[in-house]
Amino acid sequence: MAERVSLTLNGTLLSPPPTTTTTTMSSSLRSTTAASLLLRSSSSSSRSTLTLSASSSLSFVRSLVSSPRLSSSSSLSQKKYRIASVNRSFNSTTAATKSSSSDPDQLKNAREDIKELLSTKFCHPILVRLGWHDAGTYNKNIKEWPQRGGANGSLRFDIELKHAANAGLVNALNLIKDIKEKYSGISYADLFQLASATAIEEAGGPKIPMKYGRVDASGPEDCPEEGRLPDAGPPSPATHLREVFYRMGLDDKDIVALSGAHTLGRSRPERSGWGKPETKYTKEGPGAPGGQSWTPEWLKFDNSYFKEIKEKRDEDLLVLPTDAAIFEDSSFKVYAEKYAADQDAFFKDYAVAHAKLSNLGAEFNPPEGIVI
C-alpha cells in the first residue's frame, strides 16, 4: 500500500509561544520538485502525520530551529524540521485584509523570480496544481466570502493542506516560500495564481488573461471543508466531474479544456494511489525521478494529452477513469476530439478556462482587479 504524507500543525495562530514543543514523525517527508495530480484518489492509503504544537510566529519557529532544548529532544533531523517550518511560515504571516491589495510592481518582479525558479527546479506541474487546488474549492451556491471557497489563499493553512487531495503540496509552499518573503506586498491568493499561470506559459502553453488583487482569507477558520475537489476514480466519472465543476459554475467545455493540463506532470502512487512508481519517461530527470506521466514530454504544455488518450498506444502513459471519460461521454467527446486535432483551439479555450478558474470565489481589491 502506498504511503501518503501530510502535515498537521496544531496551535492557535498569532498566539504567544507555548512553553513546550513536541515534535513527532512516523515517516520521512520526501521533497520533490516536479509532480502533479489535479485529481485526488478515491482509494485508501496509509498516512504519516507530523504534528507540531507551537506558536505561529515565524520568528519563533526560526528560534526553535536553533534551540538546544529542541535539538536534544526532537526525533527529527534539522532538514526535516525545516520542511515543516516552511509550512509554518505560510500559516503564521498575517493575512491581507480587505483594505489591502497586491502591489503591481512586486507582482511583475515576482513573476520574473518564478520564471527563474521554473528554469532551475522544473516545478511547473506542482505550481499549476497549487493554483488549481486553492481555486477549485469554490461553491457558487454560497454567497459569503470567504466561506464560498475559491482563490483566497486558504490553502496555506495546515487544516486545508492536510486534505487528502492536497498531498504533496507542502513541496509547492517550500518552493515559493522565499518569493513570498521577498515580496510581502503580494497576497498568498495572488501568488498561488501567478505561479500557476506562469508555469503554464513557461511550459509552452498559452498566455493566460490574468488579473490580480485577490484578498487573502484571514485564518484557518476560513478554510473549506474537505471533499470539494474532484476524485480520480469515482464510480461514475463523467457524472462526478459535472457535479464538481458545475458547482464551481464551469461547463463541459471548461471541464475538458482544463483536463488538458494533465499534459504536464506525473502521478505518484505514494501520494495519490494512482500510477506506476516509474516509467521509461520518468525514471530519470529533470526533477526528482519517478511517477507515471500522461504524456511522454511531461514538462511541455501542448495537446498531446488528448492525442495519447485517443490513441491508447502506450502502457507507460497514465489514463485515469476521469481522463477516459472525456472520450466516452458524448458531450465531453466533442471537445476532446476537437482539441486532439487542433492545438490552437485547445490553447484558446484553455486560456479562457484557466483564467475563469483562477478568479473563482476571489474577493478583488480594487474590484476590477489589477492587470500586469
UniProtKB/Swiss-Prot annotation:
**Domain of life assignment:** Eukaryota
Q: Which Pfam families match?
A: peroxidase (PF00141)
Q: What is its main location?
A: mitochondrion
Biased composition of type Basic and acidic residues is found at 267-283
Q: Kindly state which keywords UniProt assigns to this record, in alphabetical order.
A: Calcium, Chloroplast, Heme, Hydrogen peroxide, Iron, Metal-binding, Mitochondrion, Oxidoreductase, Peroxidase, Plastid, Potassium, Transit peptide
EC number(s) per UniProt? 1.11.1.11
Q: What residue stretch is labeled transit peptide in the record? A: 1-91
Q: Where is this region: Disordered?
A: 1-28, 217-237, 261-294
- The residues annotated as the active site are H133 (proton acceptor)
Report the locations given in the UniProt record: Mitochondrion; Plastid, Chloroplast stroma
What does the record's cofactor remark say about binding?
Binds 1 heme b (iron(II)-protoporphyrin IX) group per subunit.
Q: Which InterPro entries match?
A: Ccp1-like (IPR044831), Haem_peroxidase (IPR002016), Haem_peroxidase_sf (IPR010255), Peroxidase_I (IPR002207), Peroxidases_heam-ligand_BS (IPR019793)
Tell me its family. Answer: Belongs to the peroxidase family. Ascorbate peroxidase subfamily.
Q: What is this protein called?
A: L-ascorbate peroxidase S, chloroplastic/mitochondrial
